[in-house]
From Swiss-Prot:
GO terms for biological process: rRNA 5'-end processing. GO terms for cellular component: cytosol. This is Putative pre-16S rRNA nuclease. GO terms for molecular function: nuclease activity. NCBIfam families: RNAse_H_YqgF.
Length: 146
C-alpha cells in the first residue's frame, strides 16, 4: 500500500456532514466545511468538488459507536455512506470511532469564544470531523508518508 499524504475526514450526519482535511507531513487535521444533507444524503456534486479540489489519498469517516463500543443505528448508516464514497469515487475509505467528538467539538467552540446562535445555524460538524481525523492520524502513523 502506498503511503498516505492527504486525507479528508468526515463527520457523517443526517442533516449536516462535517469535513476536515489532514496532512501526513504535519500530522495535523483542520476543519474545512460543513455540507448540508437530507436524511443523510449529501449533494454528491459538492462531495465530488471537494474530492477534485483536495485529491485525497483516503477518506476517514467517523463511526458513531455506542458508549459501550457496540454499533449504533447511525453506525450502520455511516458504514453505508463509506461504501458509497468508495463506490462513487474509487477512493480508499477508513472508518474511525468518533464517540464524543461532537461533545468535544462543542467544548472547543465554547473555548474559542462561545456559540453564536443555534448549532444548526453555526454547526460544529467540521470541528468534529477534524477531531476524528486527528484521532485517526495519531493512531495510524505507519500509514502516513512522513
Amino acid at each position: 500500500m502506498a503511503a498516505l499524504r492527504l486525507l479528508l475526514g468526515i463527520d457523517y450526519g443526517t442533516k449536516q456532514i462535517g469535513v476536515a482535511v489532514g496532512q501526513a507531513i504535519t500530522g495535523q487535521a483542520r476543519e474545512l466545511c460543513t455540507l448540508k444533507a437530507q436524511n443523510g444524503v449529501p449533494d454528491w456534486d459538492k462531495v465530488q468538488a471537494l474530492i477534485n479540489e483536495w485529491k485525497p489519498d483516503a477518506i476517514v469517516v467517523g463511526l458513531p459507536l455506542n458508549m459501550d463500543g457496540t454499533p449504533s443505528e447511525m453506525s450502520a448508516r455511516a458504514e453505508k455512506f463509506s461504501r458509497k464514497l468508495n463506490g462513487r469515487f474509487g477512493v480508499t475509505v477508513y472508518t474511525h470511532d468518533e464517540r464524543l467528538t461532537t461533545f468535544e467539538a462543542k467544548g472547543e467552540r465554547m473555548a474559542r469564544g462561545g456559540q453564536k446562535g443555534s448549532y444548526r445555524d453555526n454547526p460544529v460538524d467540521a470541528i468534529a470531523a477534524a477531531l476524528l481525523l486527528q484521532g485517526w492520524l495519531d493512531e495510524h502513523p505507519e500509514l502516513l508518508n512522513v
